[in-house]
UniProtKB/Swiss-Prot annotation:
Pathway: Porphyrin-containing compound metabolism; chlorophyll biosynthesis (light-independent). This is Light-independent protochlorophyllide reductase subunit N. Protochlorophyllide reductase is composed of three subunits; ChlL, ChlN and ChlB. Forms a heterotetramer of two ChlB and two ChlN subunits. It comes from the Eukaryota. Keywords: 4Fe-4S, ATP-binding, Chlorophyll biosynthesis, Chloroplast, Iron, Iron-sulfur, Metal-binding, Nucleotide-binding, Oxidoreductase, Photosynthesis, Plastid. Binds 1 [4Fe-4S] cluster per heterodimer. The cluster is bound at the heterodimer interface by residues from both subunits. Its main location: plastid. One of its GO terms (molecular function) is 4 iron, 4 sulfur cluster binding. GO terms for cellular component: chloroplast. The keyword NAD does not apply. The gene is chlN. Its cofactor is [4Fe-4S] cluster. Gene3D superfamilies: Nitrogenase molybdenum iron protein domain (3.40.50.1980). Component of the dark-operative protochlorophyllide reductase (DPOR) that uses Mg-ATP and reduced ferredoxin to reduce ring D of protochlorophyllide (Pchlide) to form chlorophyllide a (Chlide). This reaction is light-independent. The NB-protein (ChlN-ChlB) is the catalytic component of the complex. It comes from Physcomitrium patens (Spreading-leaved earth moss).
Amino acid sequence: MSNKISETLTFECETGNYHTFCPISCVAWLYQKIEDSFFLVVGTKTCGYFLQNALGVMIFAEPRYAMAELEEGDISAQLNDYKELKRLCLQIKKDRNPSVIIWIGTCTTEIIKMDLEGMAPKLENELGIPIVVARANGLDYAFTQGEDTVLAAMAHRCPEQNTLLDNKKVIQQDSTIQDFFSFLSLEKKEETRNNSSIKSKKHPPLVLFGSLPSTVASQLSSELKRQSVQVSGWLPAQRYTDLPSLGDQVYVCGVNPFLSRTATTLMRRRKCKLIGAPFPIGPDGTRAWIEKICSVFNIKTKDLEQREQQIWENLKDYLDLVRGKSVFFMGDNLLEISLARFLIRCGMIVYEIGIPYLDKRYQAAELLFLQNTCKSMGIPMPRIVEKPDNYNQIQRMRELQPDLAITGMAHANPLEARGINTKWSVEFTFAQIHGFTNARDVLELVTRPLRRNNNLENLGWNDLTKKEKQIKFN
């Protein structure tokens, strides 16, 4: 197989990567994001061990998630699934009283054909608590698709758009009442005037989908607000009771590349209009994301180029370190295309982008942006390999000798033993990487192995590393 990097984007498909993180890990960040929720993972002891170890939260700390462990009686159909789940949900209601209970199906529930979707509506009527069913099992391509499944299920529970119009009337009434009172301070009057000027530039409702920490979500909302774009809501909202209203007049835009199932549900089932934009990862991606949203609403952007330039100036110390370095993405979390595009813009050379699954329709804008970035930087286009075979990848890495490999945890130590610097791709999932201000965190993660190597060289250990490298590969 030729390893020459072409001048256009080339797509290949191999036999697949079988060493991936489990999608039920989405519970780790979703239970923190949706504050009034409770996640019930229906699976085996293995799932319980994974949650307890991977999430780093002990069960006796009483987090807002739990395991419904399947036993031999469940698998052999000796126990009544409905009664068992009802008992657990009654206990959850009594102890925690959440606004929603989210059942997470696993591989085992798929294999034994447990009818979670059939039981949920009956139990919901009995308990009076919404029960959302999401099959976040290991049959998906990547562990981040667990969030995609949960958000797609929650999209069905969002209220209709009419409610949104009623809320707008209430907001307008509230603002007129506030203006009426003369005891408002000058600052508050100025703020109210600014808000009314933003609202005066009417545009259809905009809902953003993708789970981000509250601080990052508010940063992106405020960046759009600077451009006179008002965000109507987020999916998921911080509280289940605050889910955004959806309908055929609502525009939706994603913030993560792994939410293709959610995007499809929003378009087909809820009749929303999808804004296909690059994802807000890195200063370049954030600017392109905002520009695309503004162009759809016929709003001219202001001072956006200067804002991006200012961020690049602040990243100068990191850019000097990564410029000219090469990176190889083995593929793990579906963030690879966006991260590769950002690193190319930083001056790095990307040999290959391995990705477990690529939805070319949902990521069309990102792929085009990647191509344009490569052309503007004068860097050859990387090969994109869907479902990469790890054995073939290691052969290619041996020939290309990248400075850094971004890989899943299963391959990190073996690659380090062969003298290749690695970075766990799962760290990019849990880190705050979206928006203008968080670009520094991305480069902090990428440069950590490179800075470690520089420190080792200063200690005179570089010769030992090189000798080991030759021994292992030859």
